[in-house]
Amino acid sequence: MAAGPLRGLAVAGGGESSESEDDGWEIGYLDRTAQKLKGPLPVEERQETFKKALTSGNISLVEELLDSGISVDTSFQYGWTSLMYAASVSNVELVRVLLDRGANASFDKDKQTVLITACSARGSEEKILKCIELLLSRNADPNVACRRLMTPIMYAARDGHPQVVALLVAHGAEVNTQDENGYTALTWAARQGHKNVVLKLLELGANKMIQTKDGKTPSEIAKRNKHLEIFNFLSLTLNPLEGKLHQLTKEESISKLLRTDSDKEKDHIFSSYTAFGDLEIFLHGLGLEHMTDLLKEREITLRHLLTMRKDELAKNGITSRDQQKIMAALKELEVEEIKFGELPEVAKLEISGDEFLNFLLKLNKQCGHLIKAVQNIITELPVNSHKIVLEWASPRNFTSVCEELVSNVEDLSEEVCKLKDLIQKLQNERENDPTHIPLMEEVSTWNTRILKRTAITVCGFGVLLFICKLTFQKK
């Protein structure tokens, strides 16, 4: 059946333009009217006929010309062979015929390999995948790079083909190789906004911390190109997907990675990529996709899930095995509590002035860090709810926590004021004690300043939390 022509010219060199004159290669499925050779043709005319047969996808004529003695690896003006042209348009049947006739699957022209050409082809992923399977079955090397040091997996990631990426890795492709600009396959996927490819690469062990030559990580590249969901996911400290399939054999890897050919898996995984939130991504990484509906029915968000205890997980119908996976992930996500240091026992009345001063200084410094953290949150918080990229719980939950924070800060402020009054009282008593030898005034003044600064800092933190609370209420 005939199909319309592909309007662009096939260009050699991995998408780089050529200054050579037009070779007339409009690759595509043109008029597929059966043609037969009327008799022996001169060499030049035979090559021109061969080119037209390839252009039109006339497989029977291609086979007849090959039978007449024309070389299957005949190169044309750009130096491309017939196999490269067939791969560039993902003509699976033509690729199969040429390979069966002895075409060189490892051929390259200026480091542009047939496999790279197939990976960067314009066509459906299904056809591209089949062409690449054929080339890999003929020992095409998935790690040979082009002049820009881009490997086939980078082209597949750039063009958004997760199954092709998986197939290449199953045949030995290196996931973390870098091109001339320091881009990895993950960087390319993040740059182009291909979330499904990002997920697949992380599952295959891609390192999200590798930097480009200008010092950018994949998450920063995603942010720069306004792919905020990918940026948020890659910014998570935990990568539960990483290396998930490393322990499988080659056959198991191919089977597992390509099982998405079934309609059921496509519906469950690929169709849901467009609607993935942070909860789905987290569960997918742990292999707990089956829990998504359960958690959504119970209105449990990721942030709620991350704060649940083991008994709460059990009450919500989560099995022991799934609980273990979640708790292990939560353990990796735990944030270290701020440690102020331990004071000597006050009851012994042996606390030194230096130790007490160090405690106050440390407390004051930590309060300053907390104030800065809240200021950053207020600055970064989206002004409008429609700008929030990932799934959020009800703002009422956030407001409730802010209310508790304000209450705690008020309590802290009250206690610090009591401490200040107590120290002031002690200071006054010592000054009025005729037996006391007064210390240097500078020390007394310094202690007073520290106490005042601590009290002011705590009060300021309370005001900031109050502002934060009002901000959430407005949203």
UniProtKB/Swiss-Prot annotation:
Assigned GO CC terms: pi-body
Q: Which InterPro entries match?
A: Ankyrin_rpt (IPR002110), Ankyrin_rpt-contain_sf (IPR036770), Asz1_SAM (IPR042650), SAM (IPR001660), SAM/pointed_sf (IPR013761)
Q: What is its main location?
A: cytoplasm
Q: Which organism is it from?
A: Ovis aries (Sheep)
Q: What is this protein called?
A: Ankyrin repeat, SAM and basic leucine zipper domain-containing protein 1
Subunit relationships: Interacts with DDX4, PIWIL1, RANBP9 and TDRD1.
Arranged from A to Z, the UniProt key words for this protein are: ANK repeat, Cytoplasm, Developmental protein, Differentiation, Meiosis, Phosphoprotein, Repeat, RNA-mediated gene silencing, Spermatogenesis
- Renumbered residue ranges of the record's region Disordered: 1-24
Q: Where is the signal peptide?
A: none
Q: Which GO terms describe its biological process?
A: cell differentiation; male meiotic nuclear division; regulatory ncRNA-mediated gene silencing; spermatogenesis; transposable element silencing
Q: Where in the cell is it found?
A: Cytoplasm
Keyword Repeat attached: yes
Q: Which residue range or ranges hold the SAM domain? A: 272-334
| Keyword match Ligase | no
Q: Which Pfam families does the entry link to?
A: Ank_2, Ank_4, SAM_2
Function, as annotated: Plays a central role during spermatogenesis by repressing transposable elements and preventing their mobilization, which is essential for the germline integrity. Acts via the piRNA metabolic process, which mediates the repression of transposable elements during meiosis by forming complexes composed of piRNAs and Piwi proteins and governs the methylation and subsequent repression of transposons. Its association with pi-bodies suggests a participation in the primary piRNAs metabolic process.
Each ANK repeat occupies one of these ranges, namely 45-74, 78-107, 110-144, 148-177, 181-210, 214-243
PTM Phosphoserine: at which residues?
S17, S18, S20
